[in-house]
Amino acid sequence: MIAALIAAGLLSAFDWSDGCRPVAGSEALWRDDVRYVFVGETHGTVEAPAAFADLVCAALEQGPVVVSLEYPVEFQPTLDAFMEADTEAEARAALAAYPHGPFVHHDGRGSEAMLDLLLRLRAMLREAADMTVVASVPNSPRVEGFRQSYAEMDRAVLWSRQAMAQPHSRLLALVGRVHAEKIRRVGSPLGLPAAAHIRPEETLSLSVAHQGGEAWMCRDDCGGAPIPNVDA
């Protein structure tokens, strides 16, 4: 049901001058007891970042927001420079100056759609939106015998610290689908996903439902890959 709320916002192009598009049914998300809203996506689509931006707009109507994006914490100074630049050209230059990461290798988190999301968030901030944009991938050490499940715990700790730093804000996170899930997948070596480590009464996890199409993915090679048709 909740996943359909995201899917409902994917139908038309966005122009910042037209303002934010309403997301039908999003009022169900803004309960007083919900501190975290996690949006799980398949990286590399056009639609998910656009819908997430609309959801951020809706959240800002309710109060201050922390926007947590799936970039490494080392990327935070670049995010800050992008958001604070005087002009869009300077913002783009700050992003291009980062020596590695998704906007150099262009995986699904460094797509034109994600750049459009960052530009929309920047525009909201320039309109005095009560919002902070933060990176959400911790620098977890790679230690033999300690699998991805430990990185998931680190990610949950980082989210909680971001929330505690601004206790009157709601945290909205856009992450890969698995990190937003609240139970362990059957047979998965991942262990508990990051969102499952946070008190469930304070969290809502959404999953973007796609009706087919493709996503830009980088595995052995980068390119378009089909994504499953999900009945929202």
Outline where the language-model segments fall.
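Sec-dependent signal peptide recognition
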Residues: 1-8
